Amino acid sequence: MKISKTLFKNLTRCKNFSGYYDIYINRTFSNVKVVDNNINMNDLDNIDITSLDENTEILDSMFDEETGEDLLHVSNAQLEAFQSIYVEVEKLAIEYARSLFGDSIKSSEETKNQQYFEYITEENNYYCYLDGYQEEEDEVNIFEVKSTTSRKFDDLHLTLRTTKNYLGDKKALFIKNKKGIYDFVAYDYLGLEYNNKIITINDIEKAMEKLLDPYSDVGKYIYDVAIEKYIIENSSQNINKKVNYYLIVLNHEYTLENENCKYVIDKNGQSLFKVYNISIIVEKLHTEIAKKKEELEYNLRSLLINRNQIGKCCEYKKTTQCVFFPICWKKLREDGSILEFLNKRFMNKSDKTKSFNVFELANQNIYKIKDAYEYIYENNNYYQYKCIIENSEFIDKERTRWALSQIKYPIYYLDFESYNSPLPRFYGEHPYSQSLFQYSLHIEKEENVCNIEKNHKEYLAPDHLDHRIDLIKSLIKDIDLTNGGTVIVYNENFEKTRLKELAEIFPEYSRKLLNIRSHIFDLCQVLNGKGKMYMGDLLYQKNKKELPTFAFYNNNLHGSFSIKKVLPVFSDLTYSTLDVKNGTEAILTYGILPTLTEKEYQEKYLALRKYCRQDTWAMVEILWNLKKKADF
C-alpha cells in the first residue's frame, strides 16, 4: 500500500482506523476479521442477524445505499475559502527562507515537482513531498511551511513553581539567533539555577509535552515533520549528511504597514514569517514514529474493529477530525448524549479519588446524560441532568430579570462579519486578523417597537478594497449614544475586540469607537452566566453554590449557547431558507465576490445582507421572548 504522510497520521490514530479504511476503500467486509468482537461478516454460517445488521450499518454510514454517494467526505470550508492564499503563503515562505539560507532551496507550487522521498518495506511504500529542500556540501536543510501563526510556539515556556501559588519567571523554549532563526534552547537550561531551584531533565520534558503530543495545537506540526524525518532516514536515497529540520510559520507579531509594498519588515523589525529549528524535537520522536509504523503494519494485517476506542485521537470538532467519526461516535451524536454536558469532567460518587473525561465514560458504554448520574459532581451538569430526566426547562427568573434591568433604551443590536485572511490585507492588520467587511444593526428605540426592515441599518463592503473607514463612519453615524443606550451583541469578545482593534489602527475615531464598546451588553451571558454579567447580582452571589452558572437551559440547546442553537428555543425564525446560512458561508461568499458576473454578484451581495440582518433580528426575538419567559 502507498502511504502518504497524511495517511500515516490517520492509520496511527487508533486500531480501528485500518479496519474502517479497508471497508471504505473496498466497500466490503471481505478483509475485516472482527467487528465489535463479532464473527467475520463473511462467515455467514456462524453469524447471527444482529451481527449482520450491525456490520451493514457501518457500510451504510459510509455510502448512500441507493446512490452510492460518499457520506463521509466533508469539504473543509476554510481550505476552500483561502486555498489560493495558502499557495501564496508557501511561495512567500520559501522566498523568506532563501533570504536566510540562500537561493539553492528547491521548491515548487506543484507537489509532483517537489523533492520526493520514499521508504519501501515488504508491505508498504511510505512517501513524502517536501515544501523546501536544500542540499549543501556538509548538510541538508528541510523546510516545512504551515499556514498557522507563531503565537502558539512563542507562548511555550519552561516555568518552575517557586511557591504553591507563584510560578515565577518564564524561560522561552525558542530564542532567535543572529541569523534570524528561532532555535530550540530548552536543553541549554539544564543544570542552571532558576528561582532558587536547579533545572532538571524532568522540568525540560514537562515543558516539551505539548511539542511531543501529535494532537496538541503545536505538536501536530512537529509530528508532521517527524514522519518526514523517519521516511527520509529510511529511504534508499542515502543522504549521509547532517539533516536540519525547519518549520516556517506566519509571524503573529507582524503588522502590515504599506499595502503597495507588501510584506517588507515592519517598523518593529518583524518579518512576515518566523523559522523554527525543530531538529532536536523531531529527533525525540524518532523512536515513537518507528513504533507507530510497526503498529500501523500490524493493524493493516489484522484489521480489527472495536467501537470502544474513542479518545482525543478522534480530534472531535477540529478541522482534522477523523473521517470515521460519524461511525465511532454514532451513539454520542444522539440527542441527550454526554457530549451535551457543559462540564466534561466527571467523578464517580462512590470513588472521588478518580476523575473521568467524556471519552472514558463513553468507552464504558455510558452514552446518555440520563445514565451518568453517578458521575455528576457539579451544579451545571446536575441541572442539565434534571432537565433531561424531567423533560423540563430551567430558568432562574430572578437572576434573568436582574440582568435585563441593566438594559437601557435605545437598544442597538449589533453584529459584525469579518474575513480572517492568512495574509494581512490592509494597513495595521496581522496574519489572520479578523478584517471587518460588514455590520448589521437593528434599532429598538422603545420597548418592543422594532421592525425587521424599517428599523434596520447596515454596511457591506462592495469589494475587496479597504473600506474600513467607510464602515467606521457609518457605524458611528448609526449608533447614537448621545443620550445613553445599550449596544446588544451575542458573545461580546468578538465585537469588543474588533472595536478595540479599529480604535488602535484609526486613532482619529478611537474615542467614538471605544464609547460604543463601553456600552456593549452580551445577550449570551444573560443565558450562560459567564463573564461579569452577574457579578453585581448580590442575591445570586449569595446563593451561587447551590445554583448552576447558567440562568437558562433547555434540552434543545444540546449543551451549546451558540445563537444558532438558542434561536429555535425562542423563535420560529430559521436560517435554513437563506442562501448564506452561517458565518463560514459568509466568508466563502465574500471571498468570491470579485470573481462573479454582475448578476451573480448582486445575488450574493443580497444574500450576505440578508444573512447578517438575520443575526441581529435573531437577537431581537431572543430578547423579547426571554422577557416573556422571565415575566419581565
What are these regions (language model features)?
Residues 1-142, 148-186, 343-380, 386-393:
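Metal-dependent nuclease catalytic cores that hydrolyze phosphodiester bonds in DNA/RNA
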Residues 49-66, 158-213, 268-281, 285, ...:
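Charged, glycine/proline-rich intrinsically disordered loops and linkers
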Residues 90, 94-99, 142-144, 149, ...:
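Conserved RNase H-like, two-metal-ion catalytic cores of nucleic-acid enzymes
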Residues 110-117, 409-420, 522:
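Two-metal-ion RNase H-like nuclease active-site motif
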Residues 112-116, 129, 134, 138, ...:
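Conserved DEDDh/DEDDy metal-dependent 3′-5′ exonuclease domain
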Residues 154, 256-260, 422-427, 496-505:
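A short acidic (Asp/Glu
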Residues 214-221, 227-230, 244-250, 260-264, ...:
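Acidic, Mg2+-coordinating catalytic module of metal-dependent nucleases/exonucleases
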Residues 319-425, 429-433:
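Long, internal scaffold/assembly segments composed of regular secondary structure
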